[in-house]
Amino acid sequence: MGIAQPGELAPVPRFRHLPFTIPNGIGRDTYLKIHNVMNHLGRAVLVGQHRRLIQALSSDLGVDSLVAMVSISMQDSEVCSAFSVYLTTLEQAYHWPRESTLSTPEQLEDHKLVIQMLQQPELRDTLVASVHAQYDHSATPAQVALSALSIAKQMIDQATETRSNKTKLPTEIQDLVNLLYRTSRGDWFIQGNYTDPDSHKEFGRLHEVIRTNGTQRSVQEIFQRFNGISWLQRMPLLHQNFASNSSILCAAYADLQVAMALARDELFSMVIDEPIWGLTFAKFSKGVGLCTIGAGGADCPMFRMMDALCGRADNINQAALLDELDFRSRFFPPGMRALINDLVTAPSVRSHISSGEASYELTQAFRAMEQIRYDLYEMHRKKAMRIALALRAGQQATSSGVQNATTPEKYIASTLSAAIKVRFGQEPARPQVDAFAWSTPLLCSDTGVIQTSRIQFVFSTPLAVSPGDSLRVAVEVEQGDWHIRTYSITHAYARQGSSKARDQICQAVGSAEICVRSKGQVSSFLCNQKTGFPVRVMIKPAPHFRIAGNTSPHEETLFVAQGGAVCVFLAWLAWQKQLVGTYRLVVGARNYNMLAYVGQLEKISSSFGSHLIVHVVLSRPGHGDIQRFVPGNIKASTGRVTHHLGLFSSCSTKATYVCGSASFALDVVRCLSQGPGTKREVPKVSRLQPIVTSRLPHFRLHVAAATENGTDKPCLNQITKLELALHNSPGDLWIALGDRVFDISQVPSFHPGGEKVLMYRAGRQAQDVFDTVHEGCYMISSLLNEMVIGRLDSARGEFSQWEDYLDKIVEIQNDLTNHSRIEQAPTGSIEQLAESPPVEILRGATNCFVKGWSSLLQQSGIGDSGVVSLLSSHQDAISALDAHVRMVYENDFEDPVRYANALRKIFDAHSRLVCGIHTAIDELKRHIVERLVEGDEPELTSLHISTARISQQLRETSKSY
């Protein structure tokens, strides 16, 4: 293994290769024992019998293996790193799922403590000093092992004593204890990313674990690969003289923009099943023993390094900033902590700019970099809102105390918003940069009136742009009257002399274009300017629309554009040197004269041969319009785009990207999802229908922004809360936002946040959750304007308590739906088994449901008999499940085929249970709604009957095991 420079990632151990490099002997045998247990750990975790596997390993370890491990680890740092990953992982796994306080098996703990004394530089320094003091000659591996274990145990005894005395250890001692109890989450630095099959094996290849852990390294690797670390290593010296180094710093800040933007896109693509994540990784990653550090947030060192470089918005003194960063980077390797310390103690660029002494160019370059950093934190804030779903799955604790909040969503939103204000100030939109704009007519009417124009912007400093991004433009329409609008970037021009890697989809550009229709005050102003004019701009990235491209010759990607929106695809194609597989570009326009960018379209159509197929569909073609296209390169036809899409999409289509108005985009989604000409009906689907949670949706939409009040439609039908409550199943999703009701059944097919976030509030009021993520987003308003179906009648009836009960029932049912829909439920295939979630997920789903239903029964005041029966039936089902999985482990663990089939039967039994519960709930909901609509109070016996049916379902499930 190589040696990492300050701030750089340490090399990844070659876990599978190491047995071939370790000399024969006890050390190699010990490594192979642990390596084999790691390979089987995920399979044992599936049925919750991992502790038996780990106990068997621990009983097979001893003094000889400890000394041998020390011997080979002292000779090879790569072996030491591998042992560190494996032993910390096994300790964390032993304590999962955190139902009670346990002690790590003795020999496993001893081996883990000793390897940490060798692996962690701070602990190693303590060990070396002790060994040198005890032995005049070179210490033997046995002496080193004994000293390491003795020092570690002394630290633990000291920590135990202070805890029993209700006092605290000195900070420097507690930091060393924290390193002794370093979690496997802390070892992601020396594990590969999620594509490495030998890393992050705590739960086999469970997506929620490998992506959460592995993305941390992949994000940091991207930041490092695109010069982020190399520039930060130079920053402390460059900041010593801002005046002399201003031009170098401007170039550095531009490169840091690109590095952060590419890392942000990788982080955005990290999607998970939140309930599964909450019951697996979130519980697994908590500290054990006397460690004072919990799991913490999911931010990698890039966040903290950029915090150190950019400082706080309030220019707080550097000592306070250093203390904060030191606290947040306690688990980082020493080299990363050293770089952070160097950055934060160097002269502050923010202070230099605030003093008024910075050059104009440096000020603009810093603002541009802050734009990307701000968006990075905004994206992190929105993704963190999904923690609420994980909490509902039964996670009982978080390091930040979110679970104790009355409203977790508001707690998370306020906490992260405060963090953003600390970094960017009270007005985070402030980091705009100056630009100069020119308007050029693109399309005119027969009378010469400008209908569409190209607006070109020259930026005062390079901005990081990817195809599909938008530009937030502030323009002074009248003296002192500034208006802000957001437009899609149609073309971007790289700065002179810049270069990019083959797979790089982001560049620092010096100028960009937008295409604007002459409608509305600001757009009309932009279109009709005769001379250049100053503006202020800010990039609005669109990571949800990032075009990934094909990776195989057999893959296809479909682009669908409406009119001038084709420019987004043309911009991406212009940046490609070659294409892999097939790309189909379908463009719709009224006629040839209304087809914007026709010249570029014709040019690009002949640039990639058979890899790019262009179709133009004209809805109202003029005479000779079809014949004007060059034969062979562009295929032209008449009609509506949706009438032709069935010919262009195939089962090999990897993803479909749609650009245009909201109505156009939704028509395309509807057409490709259901087939052209199909009338939309509420589908009869199971609440357990398949769901994809491991990747972004197939459809990626980039729609034109609407006005702020675009969803205010007249003559909307009145929809009661009772009717709303009946639409909370997959394929039939309604939500209320304020006083309006929306049918969002199509949204899961393109929602970047996944379907479970939508199901969370299906059939209920969702304004509070919506505002924390999408407030003020005009693009979302455009889509909602096409989905509004009525106005919510919020008047409370005579039996208002039953309306509250109904809302609670919907909430409970939504949780049950979310917790029971699993992408990789066992199928009986041994190849798929490693990606399946553990049986603990099923236990968590029923626990959450029973807890919620019991609360409903107590709230309704129907007596304790129903609650007692429900709890008793549930306990019987859990006990039967526990006994069954123990038997499966004992009888089938060594036979993967039988094991896979046994797991499938367990999950099938759970599916039958959930279907039965949903049937009972649906009938109860209909009864309540029918009675309330008729003006009668529902009978409490209906709750008794439903509860009895649910209890019976639980008892039948117990027998099925």
UniProtKB/Swiss-Prot annotation:
The keyword DNA-binding does not apply. Its cofactor is FAD. InterPro entries: Cyt_B5-like_heme/steroid-bd, Cyt_B5-like_heme/steroid_sf, Cytochrome_b5/Flavoprotein_Rdt, FAD-bd_FR_type, FNR_nucleotide-bd, Riboflavin_synthase-like_b-brl, Trp/Indoleamine_2_3_dOase-like. One of its GO terms (biological process) is L-tryptophan catabolic process to kynurenine. It holds the Pfam family Cyt-b5. Residues 716-793 form the Cytochrome b5 heme-binding domain. Belongs to the flavoprotein pyridine nucleotide cytochrome reductase family. Signal peptide: none annotated. It is an enzyme of class 1 (oxidoreductase). It comes from the Eukaryota. This is Cytochrome b5-like reductase apf12. It comes from Gibberella fujikuroi (strain CBS 195.34 / IMI 58289 / NRRL A-6831). Transmembrane segments: none annotated. The keyword Transport does not apply. Residues 429-548 form the FAD-binding FR-type domain. NADP(+) binds at residues 453-456, 499-500, 753. FAD binds at residues 298, 753-755. Pathway: Secondary metabolite biosynthesis. Keywords: FAD, Flavoprotein, Heme, Iron, Metal-binding, NAD, NADP, Oxidoreductase. Cytochrome b5-like reductase; part of the gene cluster that mediates the biosynthesis of the cyclic tetrapeptide apicidin F (APF). The non-ribosomal peptide synthetase apf1 incorporates four different amino acids to produce apicidin F: L-phenylalanine, D-pipecolic acid (D-pip), N-methoxy-L-tryptophan and L-2-aminooctanedioic acid. L-Phenylalanine is the only proteinogenic amino acid directly used by apf1. The 3 other apf1 substrates are non-proteinogenic and have to be modified by other enzymes of the cluster. GO terms for molecular function: cytochrome-b5 reductase activity, acting on NAD(P)H; heme binding; metal ion binding. Apicidin F, like the other known apicidins, is a cyclic tetrapeptides with anti-malarial properties via histone deacetylase inhibitory activity. Induction: Expression is positively regulated by the apicidin F cluster-specific transcription factor apf2 that binds to the eight-base-pair motif 5'-TGACGTGA-3' called the 'Api-box' that is found in all promoters of the apicidin F cluster except in the promoter region of apf2 itself. GO terms for cellular component: cytoplasm. Its EC number is 1.-.-.-.
